[in-house]
Curated annotation (Swiss-Prot):
GO biological process terms, semicolon-separated: DNA recombination; DNA repair
UniProt xrefs under Pfam families: RecR_C (PF21175), RecR_HhH (PF21176), RecR_ZnF (PF02132), Toprim_4 (PF13662)
PANTHER family reported for this sequence: RECOMBINATION PROTEIN RECR (PTHR30446:SF0)
GO molecular function: DNA binding; zinc ion binding
Residues annotated as domain Toprim: 83-178
Keyword Metal-binding: yes
Gene (name only): recR
Protein name per Swiss-Prot or TrEMBL: Recombination protein RecR
SMART domains the UniProt entry points to: TOPRIM (SM00493)
Length: 201
């Protein structure tokens, strides 16, 4: 059994960092050590930024984006075409599409995809909010930009079925987004091309 070589505070930091997606125990130890070595330049400012984020971050009640204001900056941006809504699984997908810079539209974050095997149904996602937004009127196009996974495609078909009979054009990202691929991992050029070549469902 390995002996503990640090105090409980450092161990706690390592354990919490290891819960961050993309960081395992080994990477978390390296990150913690780097932060501690750069205590004044990194650890202190990071601690302050995390405290501020904890106090100020909100989930937009309209679209599900993460921001410090509600409604969020995207929803209140008068320069955006609010008649076009891009539907994404997660906030990271919204950020990825914004980096691509191909469209200046509104967004709607579902908070995941339908997955009966994992017990995730329509009521567990922000689908009702989307239907309500479209029901308010003024939406001419819905771009379904979910990942090209089985769950993503199931979600896209479910949304399309729910919107039958409404006067809104429903499109999806063009093929080219690889099957099984996730938007957050694609380069900006691929995302921009996929948005431009979207097709009607």
């Amino acid at each position: 059994m390995a002996k503990r070589v640090t105090g409980p505070e450092i161990e706690k930091l390592i354990q919490l960092l290891a819960k961050v997606p993309g960081l395992g125990p080994r990477s978390a130890r390296r990150a913690a050590l780097h932060l501690i070595k750069k205590k004044d330049q990194l650890l202190g400012p990071l601690s302050n930024a995390m405290g501020e984020a904890y106090d100020k971050v909100k989930i937009c009640s309209r679209c599900g984006n993460v921001d410090t204001v509600d409604p969020c900056t995207v929803c209140t941006d008068a320069q955006r075409d609010q008649s076009v809504i891009i539907v994404v699984e997660d906030v990271s997908d919204l950020w990825a599409l914004e980096r691509a810079g191909a469209m200046n539209a509104a967004y709607h974050v579902l908070g995941g995809t339908l997955s009966p095997l994992d017990g995730i149904g329509p009521d567990d996602l922000n689908i009702r909010g989307l239907i309500d937004r479209i029901g308010e009127g003024g939406i001419r196009e819905l771009i379904i930009a979910v990942n090209a996974t089985v769950e993503g495609q199931t979600t896209a078909h479910y949304i399309t079925d729910q919107l039958q009979g409404l006067d809104v054009k429903i499109t999806r990202l063009a093929h080219g987004v690889p099957v099984g691929g996730e938007l957050d991992y694609l380069d900006e050029g691929t995302l921009a091309a996929a948005l431009r070549a979207r097709t009607v469902i």
